[in-house]
């Protein structure tokens, strides 16, 4: 009996020891080895995430463009925002030193790049080589809007977008074109009938839903996920431009029709006024841009752009609009420092503010401040001799870029509604006699300033 008990005890001890040994082996394999192995693999330069479809597509695209000397730069808002958040790390990363894919491996359907078309020397050869490398490429072309004012050239087509797909990821190459105002423009990505709508999820594209205008970015080269790429030197400035980049063209065909019906005024006085008004608009834009105050063409200046793509020669002033929330207290001083003395100041920031500055050659700059209500916007007017107040109502609007007298400027996107509010349905007919208190269909009385406030709200210089 004693002998049996000893054998049982010995067997139990052996079994327990074996179980403990197995546990130690399991623990080492699934915990310590994993932990230490990760450290070892990292120290040996393991490249985590570099097998992703997104990274491989971007790498191949960069190889393609680099070999063909195609000067592309990254404009993808998602990637640029990530780069900006880790900018110091990105700037200090050398080629090939990255061990983990942090940017180009982020899940997404597209990666957006851009190029400036005037720098592209071998477009056709590039397209063929891209397809030989395994990309399926789609080219979007359309008429060059810069030539719409020239009858003999208005049908010329230019490339606007390329979409090159590799496996399940696509590169969207946005083609930027130079415009007269020293800015970059891209066109609308409009699909023609023969194009396969299922080629890529077009609705997820971040560029091309409408034409866009951007400041010309200064570029710098950085290493991102082991790949050398060009990016805007100020990534967030470009990213912040994207949602506000919508661009609308001047209506060149309608302007030509207008001048066929109403001959253009090419007298010495008209030419001189247009020259002075253009210089005044350029100076005003430079001053407000320096302050960071957005503005748009308003009243007669906006009508001139929309109706005839030019300054109305008998208007005798330049009109700009500014949202009151964008008002800055140093606006007056900034204009005065630019050589534009204050001519009058009506109203106050809380109500009906209007500023007027004197330009050269008796051309006046009028700045109207707009106030937003629940279902409309308005700007105010004041009659100096009586203190009467007036209000001009407009349907709500947003701002778009356009090109006017060789400048990139804002206009209301809903331009027709804006023009009709101010000038009625007959805005196409030139009217040289205009009473600012009675002629506009959107004007209404708005009370009278208390005499005790006149020194503040009616200032003439």
Curated annotation (Swiss-Prot):
Subcellular location: Golgi apparatus membrane; Cytoplasm; Nucleus
Expression (tissue specificity): Expressed in the retina (at protein level). Widely expressed with highest expression in brain, heart, pancreas and skeletal muscle. Expressed at similar levels in control fetal and adult brain. Expressed in migrating neurons, including Cajar-Retzius cells and adult cortical neurons, as well as hippocampal pyramidal cells and cerebellar Purkinje cells. No expression observed in the glia limitans, the subpial astrocytes (which contribute to basement membrane formation) or other glial cells.
Pathway linked to the protein: Protein modification; protein glycosylation
Job of this protein: Catalyzes the transfer of a ribitol-phosphate from CDP-ribitol to the distal N-acetylgalactosamine of the phosphorylated O-mannosyl trisaccharide (N-acetylgalactosamine-beta-3-N-acetylglucosamine-beta-4-(phosphate-6-)mannose), a carbohydrate structure present in alpha-dystroglycan (DAG1). This constitutes the first step in the formation of the ribitol 5-phosphate tandem repeat which links the phosphorylated O-mannosyl trisaccharide to the ligand binding moiety composed of repeats of 3-xylosyl-alpha-1,3-glucuronic acid-beta-1.
Disorder: Muscular dystrophy-dystroglycanopathy congenital with brain and eye anomalies A4: An autosomal recessive disorder characterized by congenital muscular dystrophy associated with cobblestone lissencephaly and other brain anomalies, eye malformations, profound intellectual disability, and death usually in the first years of life. Included diseases are the more severe Walker-Warburg syndrome and the slightly less severe muscle-eye-brain disease.
Glycosylation sites: 92
The protein's name in its UniProt record: Ribitol-5-phosphate transferase FKTN
GO molecular function per UniProt: phosphotransferase activity, for other substituted phosphate groups
InterPro entries (UniProt xref): FKTN-rel, FKTN_N, LicD/FKTN/FKRP_NTP_transf
Region (Required and sufficient for interaction with POMGNT1): 6-27
Record's keyword annotation contains Amino-acid biosynthesis: no
Keywords: Cardiomyopathy, Congenital muscular dystrophy, Cytoplasm, Disease variant, Dystroglycanopathy, Glycoprotein, Golgi apparatus, Limb-girdle muscular dystrophy, Lissencephaly, Membrane, Nucleus, Signal-anchor, Transferase, Transmembrane, Transmembrane helix
Main localization category: Golgi
Reactions accelerated catalytically: 3-O-[beta-D-GalNAc-(1->3)-beta-D-GlcNAc-(1->4)-(O-6-P-alpha-D-Man)]-Thr-[protein] + CDP-L-ribitol = 3-O-[Rib-ol-P-3-beta-D-GalNAc-(1->3)-beta-D-GlcNAc-(1->4)-(O-6-P-alpha-D-Man)]-Thr-[protein] + CMP + H(+)
Pfam families hit by this protein: FKTN_N, LicD
Annotated phenotype, changing residue 125 to S: In a patient diagnosed with Walker-Warburg syndrome
Residues in the Lumenal compartment per record: 29-461
TM region positions: 8-28
Taxonomic source organism: Homo sapiens (Human)
GO CC terms of this entry: cis-Golgi network; endoplasmic reticulum; extracellular space; Golgi apparatus; Golgi membrane; nucleus
Cytoplasmic side: 1-7
């Amino acid at each position: 009996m004693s002998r049996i008990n000893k054998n049982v005890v010995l067997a139990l001890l052996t079994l327990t020891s074996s179980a403990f040994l197995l546990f130690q082996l399991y623990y080492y394999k699934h915990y310590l080895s994993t932990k230490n192995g990760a450290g070892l693999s990292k120290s040996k330069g393991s490249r985590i995430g570099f097998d992703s479809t997104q990274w491989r597509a971007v790498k191949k695209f960069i190889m393609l463009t680099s070999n063909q000397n195609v000067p592309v730069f990254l404009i993808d808002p998602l990637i640029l925002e990530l780069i900006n958040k880790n900018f110091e790390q990105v700037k200090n990363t050398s080629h090939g030193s990255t061990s983990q894919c942090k940017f180009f491996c982020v899940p997404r359907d597209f990666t957006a790049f851009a190029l400036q078309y005037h720098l592209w020397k071998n477009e056709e050869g590039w397209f063929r080589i891209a397809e030989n490398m395994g990309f399926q490429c789609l080219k979007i072309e359309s008429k060059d809007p810069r030539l719409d004012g020239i009858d003999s050239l208005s049908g010329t087509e230019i490339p606007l977008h390329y979409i090159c797909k590799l496996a399940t990821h696509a590169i969207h190459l946005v083609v930027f074109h130079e415009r007269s105002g020293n800015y970059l423009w891209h066109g609308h990505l409009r699909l023609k009938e023969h194009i396969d709508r299922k080629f890529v999820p077009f609705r997820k594209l971040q560029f091309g839903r409408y034409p866009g205008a951007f400041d010309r970015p200064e570029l710098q080269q950085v290493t991102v996920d082991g790949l050398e790429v060009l990016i805007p030197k100020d990534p967030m400035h470009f990213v912040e431009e994207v949602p506000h980049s919508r661009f609308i063209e001047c209506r060149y065909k309608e302007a030509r029709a207008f001048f066929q019906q109403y001959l253009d005024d090419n007298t010495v006085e008209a030419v001189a006024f247009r020259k002075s008004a253009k210089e005044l608009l350029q100076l005003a834009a430079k001053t407000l841009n320096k302050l960071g105050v957005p503005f748009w063409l308003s009243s007669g200046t906006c009508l001139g752009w929309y109706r005839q793509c030019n300054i109305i020669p008998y208007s005798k002033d330049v009109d700009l609009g500014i949202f009151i929330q964008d008002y800055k207290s140093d606006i007056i001083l900034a204009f005065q420092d630019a050589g534009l003395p204050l001519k009058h100041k009506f109203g106050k920031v809380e109500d009906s503010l209007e500023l007027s500055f004197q330009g050269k050659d008796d051309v006046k700059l009028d700045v109207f401040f707009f106030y937003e209500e629940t279902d409309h916007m308005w700007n105010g007017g004041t009659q100096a001799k009586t203190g009467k107040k007036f209000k001009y109502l407009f349907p709500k609007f947003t701002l778009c870029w356009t090109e006017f007298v060789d400048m990139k400027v804002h206009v209301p996107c809903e331009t027709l509604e804006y023009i009709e509010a101010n000038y009625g349905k007959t805005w196409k007919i030139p009217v040289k006699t205009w009473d600012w208190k009675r002629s506009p269909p959107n004007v209404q009385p708005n009370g009278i300033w208390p005499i005790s406030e006149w020194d503040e709200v009616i200032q003439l210089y």
